Amino acid sequence: MGKNITVLGAGAWGTAFGQVLADAGNTVTMWAKEQQIVEGIRDHHHNAVRLPSVEKLPDNMTATGDRAEAVKNADIVVVAIAAQFARVALVEFKGLIPDHAIVVSLMKGIERGTNKRMDEVVRESLDLPADRFAAISGPNLSKEIADRHPAATVVACTNLDNATKVAEACTTSYFKPFVTTDVIGLEMCGSLKNVTALAVGMARGAGYGENTAAMIETRGLAELTALGVAAGADPKTFFGLAGVGDLIATCGSSLSRNYTFGANLGKGLTVEEATKVSNGVAEGVPTTDAVVALGNQLDVPTPLAYQMSRVLNEGISCSEMLAGLFGHEVTGE
């Protein structure tokens, strides 16, 4: 039997995931602040602003701009808001979400200023117990999901029964969720791979080839694994769909905003210029400094994140970034 599911945020990924939920037989309500998006989904089953490639969204998808109306009957509430705005946005929903509802995060990022993961931000904002929070992460490029190409993901919750409920609610013929209790690992994978994607994109944009990309990706994986384990994650998580899988998809596709943003930097655009031509938020940009700060907090070296922070804050070139990443000491891998 289908559930009542609300998706907070009608961006490309939120809308694509809403379609997955609708295809799985649920009644889906999208919440958005933009009246144009609300009316488009509600009246025409089309999100012309954020996901124009899908000509007709399922009939069992609707939309509202009213917070209370959006969540009042929800069994599951999915959060698909830009990570750095999550806390401010979610506070407005505190006390509105039903006590039985599971809250699921699609967000990927580390909050600037607090160095907190999205699971921490969501739970604090909504005063939510850990067993009612779940996160979803994996190699899930929104356009491919929207086109219903076969894909898999991982659902994490400290309560495995609740993880399974969420997974069942988003299982379709083309979308396969797996479950885990490693919330920390899943969150760290989703956040930190965006920084790696920025660096790979920058190298590609600057004209470097496969060797350079592979070097950045593998060192990025080592960096995010070390940081994740220090935060309490299971190292195995980093070698599954949420880790290596997401890294491969994000670092190798022009559909990835982080990769594309980095590529524009590599071609010589400034951060401001790359931001203007970006279609949506490249979460790796605000996350980079937060990753460096988190590494300092956990006493874990983050050379890739540090060099990318220099790119973003000081405007160093790709060659300077790579030179800084290499260093001069001979070390063990």
UniProtKB/Swiss-Prot annotation:
GO terms for molecular function: glycerol-3-phosphate dehydrogenase [NAD(P)+] activity; NAD binding. Keywords: Cytoplasm, Lipid biosynthesis, Lipid metabolism, NAD, NADP, Nucleotide-binding, Oxidoreductase, Phospholipid biosynthesis, Phospholipid metabolism. Sn-glycerol 3-phosphate binds at residues 108, 138, 193, 246, 256-258. Its EC number is 1.1.1.94. PROSITE patterns: NAD_G3PDH. It catalyses: sn-glycerol 3-phosphate + NAD(+) = dihydroxyacetone phosphate + NADH + H(+); sn-glycerol 3-phosphate + NADP(+) = dihydroxyacetone phosphate + NADPH + H(+). The keyword Lipid metabolism applies. Its main location: cytoplasm. One of its GO terms (cellular component) is cytosol. The keyword Zinc-finger does not apply. Pathway: Membrane lipid metabolism; glycerophospholipid metabolism. The active site is at residue 193. It is found in: Cytoplasm. InterPro entries: 6-PGluconate_DH-like_C_sf, 6PGD_dom2, G3P_DH_NAD-dep, G3P_DH_NAD-dep_C, G3P_DH_NAD-dep_N, NAD(P)-bd_dom_sf. One of its GO terms (biological process) is glycerol-3-phosphate catabolic process. NADPH binds at residues 13, 33, 108, 142, 257, 281, 283. Belongs to the NAD-dependent glycerol-3-phosphate dehydrogenase family. Catalyzes the reduction of the glycolytic intermediate dihydroxyacetone phosphate (DHAP) to sn-glycerol 3-phosphate (G3P), the key precursor for phospholipid synthesis. HAMAP family: NAD_Glyc3P_dehydrog. This is Glycerol-3-phosphate dehydrogenase [NAD(P)+].
